[in-house]
Every structure is written in structure tokens, then in C-alpha cells.
From Swiss-Prot:
UniProt source species: Pectobacterium atrosepticum (strain SCRI 1043 / ATCC BAA-672)
Chief location category: membrane
Metal-binding is among the record's keywords: no
Record function comment: Rhomboid-type serine protease that catalyzes intramembrane proteolysis.
Family membership noted in the UniProt record: Belongs to the peptidase S54 family.
Sorted UniProt keywords: Cell inner membrane, Cell membrane, Hydrolase, Membrane, Protease, Serine protease, Transmembrane, Transmembrane helix
Regions crossing the membrane: 94-114, 142-162, 168-188, 193-213, 229-249, 250-270
Gene: glpG
Protein name in the entry: Rhomboid protease GlpG
Source species, domain of life: Bacteria
Cell location: Cell inner membrane
Active site annotation, chain numbering: S201, H254
Length: 276
């Protein structure tokens, strides 16, 4: 038997043990002070465990690990563990880009409350006629939010989806998805309603499409989104077209972002699912 790692959070350690059990690998978890040590019985499986552990440590709160605990019926570690604050949980799941966008978006929202929407939009709104060479505008409109509910809803989804993408695929991949979807969704919305709009929702819908389809095409991968959540997202999108919610919604941005995410996920998984 060989010691694999010691984790300070036994609940996360149990999640990894349960996940590896679904991969036909048995790990033994032993309490050691305030930590949980993981031991491997079959040393021939060490490389497989180390590879899975590396991915797990990038995104330990990914829903697939919780699903593994439900599948194996093991949710109680039997070990006393320290509690983590909301801030620690937030940082644990998110990478630097995820957190940076959240901080900047919140700062822009506060500035809008202090100086007024118009003054901030003068600098950050999608480019109007004659402003096309102000290149930041093609992306900065995603930072604009017009109500507390608007910003909370978008940042929650950005963290929930963008964090795992950055942890698993890297900051570069999340940056590409964010920039491409902001550009395309902004253009689509401006074509339909002019330049007076803002919000991260086009990027969020791109992440929804990307994570969901990637999980469907790579069931054994490390990114997934429950179909029930995807169904909710689609219902929300449809509701926006019927004005059921009683608020102004950037429907074109949502649709464009979703299409961008689906296309990027299809492209990224095409060679894996269709080997030559």
C-alpha cells in the first residue's frame, strides 16, 4: 500500500475517493490530525490515480465528484474537518481570470451607482457609429450591469461555469471563450436593439453551451452541466422573448452566446470523438 496524498479537507478527500471508486480504483482514507491521508492498495494503478488527482486538485468542487459520492452512497467521512468560509470556497473553485472579471465587474457596477449609468456607458458601451476603432468597446459592454439582480445572476453563473473551465482547460481557453462570445453576442444585440445594452449574459450563455455540450460529447471528461440546468437556461431564454419576466432582456445576445459556446465545444471535441 502506498500513500498518495494528504488533504486538509476530508470532505473533498472523500469526494475523490468516491470518484476513483467509480473508476474501479480503491483508495483508503485515514485520519491524520486535521488531515485525511489517501492510500492506494494496488500500486500498479498509481499513475492513473496521480493523473486523476492532478485534474481533481484544479477543480475539486466540480459537480461530477459530488455525483460520484451520491452514486457510491458515501457522503459522511466520519472525520471532523475545518469549515471553509464562503470566500475560501469562492477562491478555491475559481482561477485568476474568473476572479478578476468578477472584481472588475463589481467595481464597474459600483462606479455606475456613484457616477450614473450614462457616464460609465460613455466609455464602456458597445461601439456606436464612429467608435469602431475604440477596440475595448467590443468587449467592455459585458462589464455593464443595470441592477443588483442582473449582476448577481450573471456573476453566479460566470463563477459556476467559468471557474471549472479555467481550472480544467486553463486561463487561455476561458479567455478565448469570453472574448469571442462577448464580441459576437454584442454585435448580435446591437444589430437588433442598438448599443444601449450591457451584461455578461452573452458570455454566460456561451459557457452554458460549451460546458453542457462538452460534457455530452466527453462523458468521461472533467466538464459537465446537468441537463436540468441546461433546460432551465433554455426556458429562461424562451421566456425572454415573451416578456413574461417583465424586464428588458438582451435576447439576441443570449442566443448568439449560446451558439458560440456550442460551436466551440463541438470544434474542441470533434477530433476526439472522430479520430482519423
Amino acid at each position: 500500500m502506498i500513500r498518495v496524498i494528504a488533504l486538509s479537507n476530508p470532505r473533498l478527500a472523500q469526494a475523490f475517493v468516491d470518484y476513483m471508486r467509480t473508476q474501479q480504483v480503491h483508495l483508503d482514507m485515514r485520519p491524520q490530525g486535521h488531515e485525511a491521508e489517501l492510500w492506494l492498495e494496488d500500486e500498479t494503478q498509481l499513475s492513473k490515480v496521480q493523473e486523476a488527482l492532478e485534474i481533481f486538485l484544479r477543480d475539486p468542487t466540480n459537480p461530477r465528484y459530488l455525483a460520484a459520492s451520491w452514486q457510491t452512497g458515501s457522503m459522511d467521512t466520519g472525520i471532523q474537518y475545518q469549515r471553509y468560509s464562503y470566500l475560501q470556497t469562492l477562491k478555491q473553485k475559481a482561477g485568476p481570470l474568473t476572479l478578476s472579471v468578477m472584481v472588475v465587474t463589481i467595481a464597474v457596477f459600483i462606479l455606475m451607482q456613484i457616477s450614473g449609468y450614462e457616464s460609465v456607458m460613455t466609455w464602456l458601451a458597445f461601439p456606436a457609429e464612429g467608435q469602431q476603432l475604440q477596440l475595448w468597446r467590443w468587449f467592455s459592454h459585458a462589464l455593464l450591469h443595470f441592477s443588483l439582480l442582473h449582476i448577481l445572476f450573471n456573476l453566479m453563473w460566470w463563477w459556476y461555469l467559468g471557474g471549472p473551465v479555467e481550472k480544467v482547460l486553463g486561463t487561455g481557453k476561458l479567455l478565448v471563450i469570453a472574448l469571442v462570445s462577448a464580441l459576437v453576442s454584442g454585435w448580435a444585440q446591437s444589430w437588433c436593439s442598438g448599443t444601449y445594452f450591457g451584461g455578461l449574459s452573452g458570455v454566460v450563455y456561451a459557457l452554458m453551451g460549451y460546458v453542457w455540450l462538452r460534457g455530452e460529447r466527453e462523458p468521461d471528461g472533467y466538464l459537465s452541466m446537468p441537463r436540468s440546468l441546461m433546460a432551465f437556461a433554455l426556458l429562461w431564454l424562451v421566456a425572454g422573448y415573451f416578456d413574461i419576466l417583465g424586464m428588458s432582456i438582451a435576447n439576441a445576445a443570449h442566443v448568439a452566446g449560446l451558439i458560440v459556446g456550442l460551436l466551440m465545444a463541438f470544434w474542441d471535441t470533434y477530433n476526439k470523438t472522430n479520430p482519423r
